[in-house]
Amino acid sequence: MKFAHPSEKLFTEHLDLFDIPWIYEPTSFPLKWGSGSIKKMFTPDFYLPSLDIYIEITTMNQKLITKKRNKIKLASKLYPNKKFKLINEKEYYNFLTQDNKILVQEAIAS
C-alpha cells in the first residue's frame, strides 16, 4: 500500500505488531458547502474500528498542525457521533515507544 508520508507506514506497522485493525483514508467528511457543492473536505489518515476512532497524523510544521486541528474541531462539531484525534509529533513518537497492546490503545485514545 502507498502512503502519503513515511510516518503513516510506520504507524501501521506498529498497529499491525499488536493486531490492531486499521483502514487507510476510509472516508471523507464534508466540512463546508456552497453553491450546491462541497467546498471543503476532511479525509482522516486512518480509522481504527476496534477503538472507533479516526486518526490524523502530523509530524510536520506547526502551520499544518493548526490547519488540521481546525479541521478536526469542525468535523467533531458537524459529526458529534464520530471520534477524531490529531496525533502530533510528540504523541506519534510516544505511540511508537509503547510495547504492548493496552499501552498502544491508551496512547491512541488519550
Positions of predicted regions on the chain:
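Electrostatic, structured charged patches in enzyme active sites and in nucleic-acid/phosphate-binding
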Residues: 1-110
